Amino acid sequence: MGVSEGMHWQGELLHIHVAAKAGVPMLQLAEARLTTGIGVDGDRYATRLGTYSKKHHIDRQVTLIESETLDALARDHGVELSPDEHRRNLTTRGVPLNHLVGQYFRVGACVLYGGRLNVPCRYLEELLGKKVFKPLLNRSGLNCRIVVDGMIRAGDRIEWCDPRSLDVSLRRANEATALERPPQAWPDE
């Protein structure tokens, strides 16, 4: 049985965070707008002011990490990372992020596509002064593409989305966008 055939789980969006530019503290929001092709309104990657903005990738519009990973990091490695320190936009609970690569899923009314696993970076270690690189290998979160935009709120339900339930034009647009390298120019270019 494929992963998508057996996805019967339900998770929760615990926290939403954005940073206006690279290196500044993350700001926690009660709600945020996700914009297709852009990212999380007010976030450094939506405005192209992030550390990795020059390496833009269509699947890096919104980033997620599991609260269970943060718990394991503290338990197994003695490293405490608060939700505003991990530098991901969304903190989830009960969501199997590593299994969502290549899958569609809903966060509230929005639909995301799991593009690729997030890879830990030394930049985070330098920024925080905490040894997180090795402990976060293979569990650093998920980079996603926004397929259906809208508002999300802390407490929203997260669940797998059968791609057959999406409008065919949305699926085709998502697939076509994935082939673009780089995506169309940003408004300020």
Which role fits each region the language model picked out?
Residues M1-E189:
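Metal-cofactor-dependent catalytic cores
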